Design a protein with these regions (language model features):
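Helix-turn-helix DNA-binding elements, focusing on the entry/boundary residues of the two helices
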Residues: 12, 23, 34, 49-52
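Interfacial/linker helices and their anchor residues that mediate assembly or domain coupling
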Residues: 68-108
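Short alpha-helical DNA-recognition segment
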Residues: 20-39
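DNA major-groove recognition helix of helix-turn-helix/homeodomain DNA-binding modules
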Residues: 48-65
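The alpha-helix within a helix-turn-helix
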Residues: 16, 27, 56
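Short, conserved catalytic or interaction motifs in soluble domains
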Residues: 42
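A short, Lys/Arg-rich alpha-helix, primarily the initiator
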Residues: 1-18
Length: 108
């Protein structure tokens, strides 16, 4: 994922900077080691679900919003940014729209 910007990593870095905290401070508050946090922020590693949960709690942000960014990054890492990936995402969007409409009362 190093060739692409990590939206999740950038977001986490912005949260940390807004709070004027070091990686070490976040590490202590999340029990995730500093080198791993640095790699997540730089987009060199994907966070685990447990790490996302800890980061969401630490920063007091929605775990679901972190998981959305995480899922998008997993897709892009696996399939790259190209027309095929775009078309596949559009197809998934069409296929999932009825579910979203039923379960949340809104359409994508």
């Amino acid at each position: 994922m190093s060739s692409q910007k990590s939206e999740l990593g950038q977001y986490l870095r912005e949260l940390r900077k807004e709070r004027q905290e070091t990686l070490h401070q976040v590490s202590k508050g999340t029990d995730i080691d500093s080198p791993m946090l640095s790699k997540i922020e730089r987009g060199e590693r994907l966070a685990t679900n447990e790490q996302l949960k800890r980061l969401a709690a630490f920063y007091k942000v929605s775990e679901a919003s972190l998981k959305v960014k995480h899922t998008a990054e997993k897709i892009l890492k696996e399939y790259g940014i190209n027309e095929t990936t775009y078309d596949a995402i559009q197809l998934v969007n069409e296929q999932i729209a009825p579910y979203i409409t039923k379960s949340k009362g809104k359409k994508l």
